[in-house]
């Protein structure tokens, strides 16, 4: 599934995992965005405890709920992607380029599993999975494998392929959002399903994979076998729910960062009532924000987590706040201090 930033891809993935879990079926939502996973796990664990306490008070259950029990329940269907990957790297060996279980390993390690429990695995921001070279480097440096022959997409698909009955892999993909070293993009997922052992899989993809931000517009051409290929336009989310009144904003930002000057200029002309200014002066940016913030409005500054050169102007992008406390603490708690939340001196960063 593809979609513009803020269109609701993550929401669809989460809702699918939660609905499947509630129905007694096994599904897991996986994300490489650690703060997101931590906040979600904590929020759902608190909700679980609150609901179970209500059931206990009403006499519907005799079991007192615990936070530990709630966390275990939630982690069954919302996990960090790298922890899921590492779990299925346990107890395997590479034989002639193929993954095989180590003889006797899973008999002596009953807390481990070779075959995933879940039938549905949902990978959010799937374009950020690692290339073969990056995963090989990482596993070699950590002493796990000397020469691992799989990319992260190929390995994750191979995990679900171990199922004897059925399995579904859902990839939520943002176009052109491979932002860190070694991130594979949609190309690596396609190369994975091109492997002969996966030719029995049905592949459902968005028709927007032919757009330029997905493997340079050649994603559909990269697929070798079209016998089980199903192209569905409904697998693309085209409207941003974050800014539904300004759908062109995401388009403008994409064009600006891609240095598409003519296209960006045309799009900006449509956004006449949307406040967009461009400057290289931090002081001017702060001044503009203060002048245009009205009433109870709050302003802030967003900085890239990789922009360490900003340290020269006292912007510490390495700062790691307590995400759970920031997002989930009740606003009426006395210990929460929001006095500085309207002063553009602290910086958020997006990983």
Task: Label each residue range with its predicted role.
Residues 12, 16:
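Hydrophobic positions on the alpha1 helix immediately C-terminal to the Walker A/P-loop
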Residues 25-45:
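Conserved Walker A/P-loop ATP-binding site and its immediately adjacent core
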Residues 68-160, 348-350:
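Conserved RecA-like ASCE ATPase "motif II neighborhood" in helicase/translocase motors
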Residues 6:
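Walker A (P-loop) phosphate-binding loop of P-loop NTPases
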Residues 9:
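Conserved lysine of the Walker
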């Amino acid at each position: 599934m593809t979609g513009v930033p803020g269109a609701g891809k993550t929401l669809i993935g989460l809702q699918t995992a939660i609905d499947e879990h509630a129905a007694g079926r096994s599904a897991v939502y996986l994300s490489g965005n650690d703060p997101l996973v931590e906040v979600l796990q904590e929020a759902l664990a608190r909700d679980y405890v609150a609901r179970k306490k209500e059931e206990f008070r009403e006499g519907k259950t005799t079991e007192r709920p615990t936070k530990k029990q709630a966390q275990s329940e939630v982690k069954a269907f919302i996990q960090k992607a790298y922890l899921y990957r590492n779990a299925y790297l346990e107890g395997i060996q590479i034989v002639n380029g193929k993954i095989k279980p180590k003889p006797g390993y899973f008999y002596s390690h009953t807390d481990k599993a070779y075959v995933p429990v879940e039938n549905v695995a949902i990978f959010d921001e799937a374009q950020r999975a690692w290339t073969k070279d990056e995963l090989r480097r990482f596993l070699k440096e950590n002493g796990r494998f000397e020469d691992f022959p799989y990319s992260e997409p190929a390995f994750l698909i191979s995990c679900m392929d171990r199922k004897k009955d059925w399995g579904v892999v859902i990839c939520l993909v943002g176009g052109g959002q491979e932002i860190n070293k070694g991130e594979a993009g949609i190309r690596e997922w396609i190369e994975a399903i091109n492997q002969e052992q996966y030719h029995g899989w049905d592949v459902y993809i968005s028709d927007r994979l032919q757009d330029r931000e997905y493997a340079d517009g050649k994603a559909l051409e990269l697929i070798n076998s079209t016998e089980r290929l199903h192209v569905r336009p409904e697998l693309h989310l085209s409207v941003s729910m974050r800014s539904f009144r300004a759908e062109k904003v995401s388009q403008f930002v994409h064009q600006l960062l891609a240095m598409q000057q003519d296209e960006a200029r045309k799009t900006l002309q449509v956004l006449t009532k949307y406040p967009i200014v461009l400057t290289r002066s931090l002081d001017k940016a702060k001044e503009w924000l203060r002048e245009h913030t009205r009433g109870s409005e709050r302003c802030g500054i967003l900085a890239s987590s990789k922009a360490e050169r900003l340290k020269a102007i006292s912007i510490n992008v390495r700062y790691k706040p307590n995400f759970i406390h920031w997002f989930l603490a009740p606003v009426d708690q006395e210990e929460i201090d929001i006095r500085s939340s309207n002063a553009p001196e602290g910086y958020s960063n997006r990983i």
